[in-house]
């Protein structure tokens, strides 16, 4: 059954346009509450945690959701602005029925969204989301006054999460002598991430820590690393750490201003665990993970498999394989031996631990990995065009793949949101990659 409201990462859209409107949010809270109470044990009181990022619309959506949950007889614990992975952690640690995050991650402030975590700190299953959607078809009601849900504020939510993050860093190590610039994207980590690194001994220079409700991800954070690069150079810092608006993505910068994306950091995490004798089995990347990273990880003597783009699919394949480490170039990095979901702060701590234990810089940890140039062309499509049925196009794709052999990779996929065909070619030569990509793209009939 196809879902009507839930996408790959919850429900998301522009504030003020359906479904990101108060009336629907109240219905959503009520529907989710009804599903939770149906699954609860007899006489068990359901309680959910609601966290949010720093968007001004968070207040509006939080109040609407709270009303819906209360009407369904579910207690609500409010923790204010906190990273998405912080909600996952607290939901599990406090033995709650579910966690709710109000955030649109790396999107601009005009957007917002809702996603749910299970009692175990995992993203909700498709079946649970379908059950919520089915309940949304019913009219909203209200339990008796005696059964109404109550609202509480969890005042020490940030402190609890900070301590959890610190607990994932090896106890025999510290960050003394390290000068870090931390960019929190004017988002949810503005009052958590700097404290984590400072309390572990680092000298911390913070940017992107002045949220006003409208400046989240605005020229800062993991999706706009230029500000971090400039600050690292200006301060003569050893390293820069950039998170996105809800702090589940990570990008890092070394002292020279070189940017390291999620692909490269994924290799660092995998190699460090292998060097420490940990049994990994393998690593999960995505369809877009650079071929050089795949080759380097396989060179460690472990497996490598690709999931569809999106941290949800990486997590699904990790669980399917029973593996621990996965991620994607955008900076979603999963360390399931540390947390149940992707966490930018915790991933940064794991990279810092690898640097400390090896007494090497990030560049030195990656000096044997040469990232392949990757060319991505977006070609506009006619509405009726089916590229998979185009014999001429597919013949050229096959020819390019044969020419590249094992020294390159071709990926063709239609955009899920726009009338575009994405043509990606990567190989050791940028010129070869560009020519190969053009030879395919030029055969696509455009409007």
Curated annotation (Swiss-Prot):
Please provide the Gene Ontology terms (biological process) for this protein: carbohydrate metabolic process; peptidoglycan biosynthetic process; UDP-N-acetylglucosamine biosynthetic process
Q: What residues bear Phosphoserine in this entry?
A: 105
Modification note: Activated by phosphorylation.
Which reaction is this enzyme known to catalyze?
alpha-D-glucosamine 1-phosphate = D-glucosamine 6-phosphate
Q: How is the cofactor bound?
A: Binds 1 Mg(2+) ion per subunit.
Q: Name one GO cellular component term.
A: cytosol
> What is the top-level taxon of the source organism?
Bacteria
Q: Which sequence ranges are marked TM in the entry?
A: none
Listed Gene3D superfamilies? Alpha-D-Glucose-1,6-Bisphosphate, subunit A, domain 3 (3.40.120.10), Alpha-D-phosphohexomutase, C-terminal domain (3.30.310.50)
Gene Ontology MF: a single term? magnesium ion binding
> Catalytic residues?
105 (phosphoserine intermediate)
- The catalytic activity of this protein is classed by the Enzyme Commission as 5.4.2.10
- Which cofactors, if any, are listed as required? Mg(2+)
A Pfam family annotated for this UniProt entry:
PGM_PMM_III
Which residues are involved in binding Mg(2+)? Answer: 105, 244, 246, 248
Which keywords does UniProt give here? Answer: Isomerase, Magnesium, Metal-binding, Phosphoprotein
Entries under HAMAP family matching the protein: GlmM_B
Q: Could you say which protein family the record assigns here? A: Belongs to the phosphohexose mutase family.
> What's this protein's function?
Catalyzes the conversion of glucosamine-6-phosphate to glucosamine-1-phosphate.
Q: Which PANTHER family match?
A: PHOSPHOGLUCOMUTASE (ALPHA-D-GLUCOSE-1,6-BISPHOSPHATE-DEPENDENT), PHOSPHOHEXOSE MUTASE
Task: Please give the name of this protein.
Answer: Phosphoglucosamine mutase
* Gene name of the encoded protein: glmM
